Amino acid sequence: MSEGKQQFKDSNKPHKDSTDQDDDAATIVPQTLTYSRNEGHFLGSNFHGVTDDRTTLFDGEEGRREDDLLPSLRSSNSKAHLISSQLSQWNYNNNRVLLKRSILKTQAFMDQLQEENNIRPIFIAANDEREKLHVLQLNIKLDGQYNTKEKNGFNIEKKALSKLFHSQIVSVTNHLNALKKRVDDVSSKVFITGDVNTGKSALCNSLLKQRLLPEDQLPCTNVFSEILEARENDGIEEVHAIPLNIAPTLKEAIDMYSIQNPKTYEIHTLKELPDLVPQNGKYALLKIYIKDDKRPASTSLLRNGTVDISLIDSPGLNMDSLQTAEVMSRQEEIDLVIFVVNAENQLTLSAKEFISLASREKKLMFFVVKKFDKIRDKQRCKELILKQIRDLSPETYKRAADFVHFVSKNGDELPHYHNENDNEDHGDRKPDDDPYSSSDPDPDFDSLEDSLRNFVLKKRSLSKLLPAKTYLSKLLSDIIMISKSNMKMYSEEEIKINEQLETLRPEILSARAKCNDLTTSVDQMAEQTITMTYNNTKEALLNALDVPLHEYPKYQGLGQIYDFIFSTEAFIANQIDESIGSSELFAKQKTDLLVKKIYEIGKNELGDDFMCERVFRSELMFRKRKHLIGKRLKVSLSITDLFAPTWKGFLSYLSWQKPVTAPLPDIEGQTNEGQIGLMKYLGLKNYPLTQYWSRPSLLFTSKIPTLTLYFLGSTKVVGNIILNGIKLSSWSSLKKLSVPVIVVGSLLGLTYLIHDLPRALPMNLSIKYKRKLQELDYIHLNAQRTSNEVRDVLRVPTREILRSCEIIMDKKQITKKELENKKESNLLSIKFFQSLYEGTVAQKLMVEEINLDID
């Protein structure tokens, strides 16, 4: 029982450890001795109103001898035993408090590790045998092999390891919680396990001295069975079966089971055990309550008068993977492991895996090697099994005499044990039944029983608290090792980071200077091309109307003067459009050349860092409508635009000098040199003769009107001179002479204006358009439009150069920033692990100083 009082009743037999019969006879044996676990000491004789009980020996009270009652005597041996028990209990309680504090402190360390691992993944040396972890080791199994056992173990990325380590921390934290519960619990749980069909149930029956659990040559225990003293169930012997529909897993069954709540279990009799233990598909856990009151406390295991003990019989390890996993997990909740080994098979792989897991906290485990009598070479069998135990549990190997027992009898046959299940009425027991009165001596099994009782009862601190101390010591050692390895790793990383930063700084300066030079050079080339296109457009428009007269539309006579005016105006507008088109073509060519050059420079200077997938198409430039101001490029016409007389032109016309328009090539069919000379003399070379015939007004462009006026005028003047020659000096003669002169002159002037019209109209329109261009600032606006288009196009490659340079600089700056952040993070980690290391070392020293050997 975990609380209350326990009474040790007189066995009427000498203690089995006594060697001197006379001493036994002289020893005063108490009739009743009451001990309170809650108070931690033995109770006085006046407890519950007991006064002057001369059959009780405590605090000077009287007892009786083994053969007859004697007067009250003080026994110095009993007094010493009482003091020793109280000191042992005080030492146990003190160690329990220290361990609880250490567990809480270690949980705080694990929380800190978890927080650090979430922020900065913790480094775990998975393949380093020199820094092999015990509890926090990550055994990653791949293709049937563990990474820690391979020389060239596979490597896992750091973040992936940190996630695995997170799961390990959660598992360790849960284990620490289980440890804390076990330290608080005053009862002890003895876990009997082993491979399938090794006789675990038979061993359990042997320890209980009764055939309680079913035994068979085939595996029959499939459900975890925990055997407890019936006092915890009001003295009623029965089975509490926790079904799977209430608790699907073993852990849930343990947590949900409550003896005060019948809804959490089913009640069965002990007779039904053979039918219950195989039903792992129906039950998760069996709680078996039996009475172990037919034996004295000195030999009873469950009712020993010192501590509540429960035996747990488990399914075989290698029978089912799910059950094996449950057995593995159950070891965290028990205090002592009794591992049953078949001498013929020795320790299997599943057995080794369980022992390795359990040895994290349990330095000492009992090994019971059964069927040893069937082995021919017993010494060799012992050596092989002990060698396996030495590798898995070194402390157990060192104390093999107490913890490794080779049992010759297989335990399957118990002819000397009374089978309580054979009674029709289980509660009907004969008081004089002696369950082992006919038992034959078995030194091997007796040695096992003595060692087990001595370890569980007399060395309670070791059996109950040593697993917690061992686990804490190993866990703290792991934390120390992890702290040291991480501090070392971060210190080495800091050296590398400093070297990388020293190398990176000049690279950044060089890249910045190179990018500045490159972008400046590209910008200058772009500005030069933009300026060139601006000047070219401006110059083209300025020279657009400086066209030779012969390139203007041909004059077709007065009858088609309107067409001549319209065609001349259209010609001037077309000249302006052509100059704009030529300037745009020039801009396209220059832009195309520069874009290719910029891309080539970018690839040569920046290499693979310059990535441009754009394809420049110059034909897509200037696809927008011409400048809107071109719609207003219209001039008004007047009659005066047809004339532009000059004295020089008039005198040239009168003197028959060079013609107004340039001569055309020889007209087809006019091959006679004399005829050509005559037409040239008369000014008829500008048009074919047929046009002069069809359009008589074209004659005004020749010399015929002048010759006609000259001929008529000279005839009139000469006739007047001949008729009035002697009167030339008289006023009347001059008056008569001036009339024909004025008429001829007027006619000559009129013919000159008509003759000059093919020159005057183009010249006047050209002057008007030039003024209009200046008035509208048309030249500058179009030059600006062209240069802006070039600027927009060149902005793409220049920006790509700039962007590539920025990417290069950003990469280096990001690398630098990452290194600096990594350095800062490493410093924080070093500081964290330094603090964790110091705290863990101090805590480990405190744990190591807890002395559990004093009982």
Swiss-Prot record:
<dbReference type="GO" id="GO:1990626">
    <property type="term" value="P:mitochondrial outer membrane fusion"/>
</dbReference>
<feature type="compositionally biased region" description="Basic and acidic residues">
    <location>
        <begin position="413"/>
        <end position="433"/>
    </location>
</feature>
<dbReference type="GO" id="GO:0160190">
    <property type="term" value="F:peroxisome-mitochondrion membrane tether activity"/>
</dbReference>
<keyword id="KW-0378">Hydrolase</keyword>
<feature type="cross-link" description="Glycyl lysine isopeptide (Lys-Gly) (interchain with G-Cter in ubiquitin)">
    <location>
        <position position="398"/>
    </location>
</feature>
<feature type="binding site">
    <location>
        <begin position="197"/>
        <end position="202"/>
    </location>
    <ligand>
        <name>GTP</name>
    </ligand>
</feature>
<feature type="transmembrane region" description="Helical; Name=1">
    <location>
        <begin position="706"/>
        <end position="726"/>
    </location>
</feature>
<feature type="transmembrane region" description="Helical; Name=2">
    <location>
        <begin position="737"/>
        <end position="757"/>
    </location>
</feature>
<dbReference type="GO" id="GO:0048312">
    <property type="term" value="P:intracellular distribution of mitochondria"/>
</dbReference>
<feature type="topological domain" description="Cytoplasmic">
    <location>
        <begin position="1"/>
        <end position="705"/>
    </location>
</feature>
<keyword id="KW-0175">Coiled coil</keyword>
<comment type="similarity">
    <text>Belongs to the TRAFAC class dynamin-like GTPase superfamily. Dynamin/Fzo/YdjA family. Mitofusin subfamily.</text>
</comment>
<dbReference type="GO" id="GO:0160189">
    <property type="term" value="C:peroxisomal-mitochondrial contact site"/>
</dbReference>
<dbReference type="Pfam" id="PF00350">
    <property type="entry name" value="Dynamin_N"/>
</dbReference>
<feature type="region of interest" description="HRN">
    <location>
        <begin position="91"/>
        <end position="190"/>
    </location>
</feature>
<keyword id="KW-0342">GTP-binding</keyword>
<feature type="region of interest" description="HR1">
    <location>
        <begin position="484"/>
        <end position="547"/>
    </location>
</feature>
<dbReference type="InterPro" id="IPR045063">
    <property type="entry name" value="Dynamin_N"/>
</dbReference>
<dbReference type="GO" id="GO:0005525">
    <property type="term" value="F:GTP binding"/>
</dbReference>
<keyword id="KW-0812">Transmembrane</keyword>
<dbReference type="GO" id="GO:0005777">
    <property type="term" value="C:peroxisome"/>
</dbReference>
<feature type="region of interest" description="Disordered">
    <location>
        <begin position="413"/>
        <end position="447"/>
    </location>
</feature>
<dbReference type="GO" id="GO:0008053">
    <property type="term" value="P:mitochondrial fusion"/>
</dbReference>
<dbReference type="GO" id="GO:0051646">
    <property type="term" value="P:mitochondrion localization"/>
</dbReference>
<keyword id="KW-0496">Mitochondrion</keyword>
<keyword id="KW-1133">Transmembrane helix</keyword>
<keyword id="KW-1017">Isopeptide bond</keyword>
<keyword id="KW-1000">Mitochondrion outer membrane</keyword>
<dbReference type="GO" id="GO:1990627">
    <property type="term" value="P:mitochondrial inner membrane fusion"/>
</dbReference>
<protein>
    <recommendedName>
        <fullName>Mitofusin FZO1</fullName>
        <ecNumber>3.6.5.-</ecNumber>
    </recommendedName>
</protein>
<keyword id="KW-0832">Ubl conjugation</keyword>
<feature type="binding site">
    <location>
        <begin position="370"/>
        <end position="373"/>
    </location>
    <ligand>
        <name>GTP</name>
    </ligand>
</feature>
<feature type="domain" description="Dynamin-type G">
    <location>
        <begin position="184"/>
        <end position="467"/>
    </location>
</feature>
<feature type="compositionally biased region" description="Basic and acidic residues">
    <location>
        <begin position="1"/>
        <end position="19"/>
    </location>
</feature>
<dbReference type="GO" id="GO:0003924">
    <property type="term" value="F:GTPase activity"/>
</dbReference>
<comment type="function">
    <text>Essential transmembrane GTPase, which mediates mitochondrial fusion. Fusion proceeds through several steps; first mitochondria are tethered together, then brought into close contact, followed by the formation of a docking ring around contact areas, and finally membrane fusion. Fusion of mitochondria occurs in many cell types and constitutes an important step in mitochondrial morphology, which is balanced between fusion and fission, mediated by FZO1 and DNM1, respectively. Functions antagonistically with DNM1.</text>
</comment>
<feature type="topological domain" description="Cytoplasmic">
    <location>
        <begin position="758"/>
        <end position="855"/>
    </location>
</feature>
<dbReference type="InterPro" id="IPR030381">
    <property type="entry name" value="G_DYNAMIN_dom"/>
</dbReference>
<comment type="subunit">
    <text>Homodimer. Dimerization depends on GTP binding. Component of a large multiprotein complex of 800 kDa. Binds the cytoplasmic domain of UGO1 which binds MGM1 through its intermembrane space domain. Interacts with MDM30. Interacts with UBP2 and UBP12. Interacts (when ubiquitinated) with DOA1; the interaction recruits FZO1 to CDC48 and promotes FZO1 proteasomal degradation.</text>
</comment>
<dbReference type="InterPro" id="IPR027417">
    <property type="entry name" value="P-loop_NTPase"/>
</dbReference>
<feature type="region of interest" description="Disordered">
    <location>
        <begin position="1"/>
        <end position="27"/>
    </location>
</feature>
<dbReference type="GO" id="GO:0031966">
    <property type="term" value="C:mitochondrial membrane"/>
</dbReference>
